[in-house]
Amino acid sequence: MTNSNLRTENHFDYVKITLASPERVMSWGQRTLPNGQVVGEVTKPETINYRTLKPEMDGLFCEKIFGPSKDWECHCGKYKRVRHRGIVCERCGVEVTESRVRRHRMGFIKLAAPVSHVWYLKGIPSYVAILLDMPLRDVEQIVYFNCYVVLDQGDHKDLKYKQLLTEDEWLEIEDEIYAEDSTIENEPVVGIGAEALQQLLEDLDLKEIAETLREEITGSKGQKRAKLIKRLRVIDNFIATNARPEWMVLDAIPVIPPDLRPMVQLDGGRFATSDLNDLYRRVINRNNRLARLQEILAPEIIVRNEKRMLQEAVDALVDNGRRGRTVVGANNRALKSLSDIIEGKQGRFRQNLLGKRVDYSGRSVIVVGPKLKMHQCGLPKEMAIELFQPFVIHRLIRQNIVNNIKAAKKLIQRADDEVMQVLQEVIDGHPILLNRAPTLHRLGIQAFEPKLVDGRAIQLHPLVCPAFNADFDGDQMAVHVPLAIESQTEARMLMLASNNILSPATGEPIVTPSQDMVLGSYYLTAIQPEASKPDFGDQSKTFASLDDVINAFEDKRIKLHDWVWVRFNGEVDDDDHGEPSHSETLEDGTRIEQWNLRRDRLDEQGALISRFVLTTVGRVVMNHTIIDAVAIA
C-alpha cells in the first residue's frame, strides 16, 4: 500500500520482544552512507553548539548519524532544496533527506567494557542468577567489583569453578602461585565485573543443562523440585527464542532517535532537555574516560573503579533507582530513565499505544439511577448531542429542517426543541457501550439503551455495579457509540446488561442486590410491631386492587407500614396450617373462611370466588414492582 509520498507501509501481525544480540544492537544504529562511509557510533557527550545552535558532530544530536535537523539541508548549508535528495555532503558528511528521519534513525555507543543489563540482574526473578544457579547477592558482588570469581580452577586444589574470592584471598593465592617452590603449572583464572559474568554465561551449554535438569526433576520433590523447574523454564525459553545468555551483558548500547528525546529552546534563551540526554551524557563521559585510561595503561584499581562507574551509569540509563543511589537532576528530581518512559499508567504502552483517544466517545461521573430499567442508562443531553451529532445532522437534513451541515450545526448549538426531538428519535433503539476502567473481565464493557437526562452525570442502574466493580463515590465511566449496524446488533444481542446476569468466571449470578437495595427491600417489607391490624371492611383500610393501595399511598392517605386488606387473586404463601380461625356460610350458599392473614370466599363446591389478604402497604409496593418488571421482561 503506497501513499502520496511513495512510502511503503509494512503490515505486521504482532510485536515480539526478545533479547537483542550485540550484532543486532549495532545494526540498529550502524548505517553505510551512499559514499561508503559507515556512521552510527556516538562518541561525544555534546548535544548542540550553544553559539550556532546546530548539533555537534558525533554527539547525541549528530546530523551525520541521525539525519538533518532541517528538511533537505545539510549541516554546513552547502546543499539546500529537495533537488539534492540522497546526496551526501562531501564537506560535512550529512545525507540530504527529510528531517523526520530523526524520529526513527538510531545510533549506538560502543562500550569500552561490557556491562550487565540491570533488568536481568536486578529484576524479580533475577534471570542471571537463575541461569548461573548462584545467589543474587554473589552475582552482584561480581558485577559491582566487590569479589573475584573463579573462571577456571587450573591445578589449584582448593579452588572451585564459580567460587567467590575477596581481594585479600586472591592476593594470597597469587603469592602461592608465583612462589619459587610452586608446583602449579596450569594457573587458575579469575575474573571480576561484567566481563567475568559474560564469560560465565558463555560457558553455559543450555541444551545439556536442560537435559540434566529434566533428569534431576524426576527424582526430586518439594522446594528443590520447584527451584529446578524454575531454572528449566528459563533455559527452555532461551532455547525456544534462540537467545544466548551472554546477550544479557551489553557490549554496545543503542541510542534512541534524537526527536524522541528533544532539546527545545525556551523564551529566555535557556534550553529544556529530556532527562535521557543527561543519562546518555553520563554514559558517554564515563565510557570515553575508561577508554582513555585503558589506552594509557592506568593502574588496575583506577580502571576497575571507572568500569564500576560505567556500570552504574548504564543502570541509571536503563532503570534509574533500580539499584544504588537514584540519579537526580536540578532541584533534586529523579531523572526519567528508559524504563520510566515505558512502564506504568503514564508509560508508552498504556498511555500512547493502548490508550489512544477514540472518536464518538465521552467520559463522565456516574450517579445512581434507581428508576431506570436494568438495560437502560441515563445519558446527559449535552453528551448525547455531541456523540450522536452526525446522526442528528443527517436526520435534520433528511427531514428538510435544514439544508446543509453548517445550518444543522448552528441549530444544534442553539439546542433547539426540534433538535432535541430529532435526538430522541436517533437514540431510540441505538445502544451505547459503557466501560469502566480497569476492564478486568468481559463484563467491564456492557451495552445499554440510553435515556436522555438533565445534568452532566451518567446514570447507572445499581444492579449492574458489581459487574463493573463500580460505586458512586466519584467513579467515572466512558461511553462509546457503536456506529455500524453490525456492531449495534452485536451490542444489543451479546452485550446488553440484561443479558449478562451470570459471571463468566464462576457461572454464579453477578447481578445480586446489595447494600442500599437490600436495606431498602428490608425497610419496604418490614412490619412495625406497634402497627394495629384493621378489621375487614374498614373503609379506610380495605382496597379492591393493588393499584388502589398504591394510589392511596401516593395520595398520603395511608403510610408505608400500615396494615391493609387488599383484594388479590394471585398465589399467596400458605403460612396458615390447620383450620381457619372463623368459618361462616352465607344465605346464597357461599362460604367465608377467615384465616390469620387472609379472607377467602368459596362457592358450594369449595372453589375460590375472591380473596382478600392482610398485608402492609410496603409489601404491596414491592409485589407490584416485581410483577411489573417480570411482565415487561
From Swiss-Prot:
* InterPro entries on file: DNA-dir_RpoC1_gamma (IPR012755), DNA-dir_RpoC_beta_prime (IPR045867), RNA_pol_asu (IPR000722), RNA_pol_N (IPR006592), RNA_pol_Rpb1_1 (IPR007080), RNA_pol_Rpb1_3 (IPR007066), RNA_pol_Rpb1_3_sf (IPR042102), RNA_pol_Rpb1_clamp_domain (IPR044893)
Cite the GO molecular-function annotations of the record.
DNA binding; DNA-directed RNA polymerase activity; magnesium ion binding; zinc ion binding
Q: Is Lyase tagged as a keyword? A: no
Q: Which GO terms describe its biological process?
A: DNA-templated transcription
Cofactor: how and how many bound: Binds 1 Mg(2+) ion per subunit.
Gene Ontology cellular-component terms for this entry are: DNA-directed RNA polymerase complex
Which residues are involved in binding Zn(2+)?
Answer: 74, 76, 89, 92
The family database entries (SUPFAM superfamilies) matched by this protein are listed as: beta and beta-prime subunits of DNA dependent RNA-polymerase
Catalysed transformations (reactions): RNA(n) + a ribonucleoside 5'-triphosphate = RNA(n+1) + diphosphate
User: What cofactor requirement does the entry state?
Assistant: Mg(2+); Zn(2+)
Q: What is its EC number?
A: 2.7.7.6
Q: Which UniProt keywords apply?
A: DNA-directed RNA polymerase, Magnesium, Metal-binding, Nucleotidyltransferase, Transcription, Transferase, Zinc
Q: Broadest EC class?
A: transferase
- Positions with a binding annotation for Mg(2+): 471, 473, 475
Answer yes or no on keyword Repeat. Answer: no
- Hey, which family's this protein in? Belongs to the RNA polymerase beta' chain family. RpoC1 subfamily.
Assembly and oligomerization = In cyanobacteria the RNAP catalytic core is composed of 2 alpha, 1 beta, 1 beta', 1 gamma and 1 omega subunit. When a sigma factor is associated with the core the holoenzyme is formed, which can initiate transcription.
Q: What does this protein do?
A: DNA-dependent RNA polymerase catalyzes the transcription of DNA into RNA using the four ribonucleoside triphosphates as substrates.
NCBIfam families xrefs: PRK02625.1 (NF002729), rpoC1_cyan (TIGR02387)
Q: What is this protein called?
A: DNA-directed RNA polymerase subunit gamma
Gene this protein is translated from: rpoC1
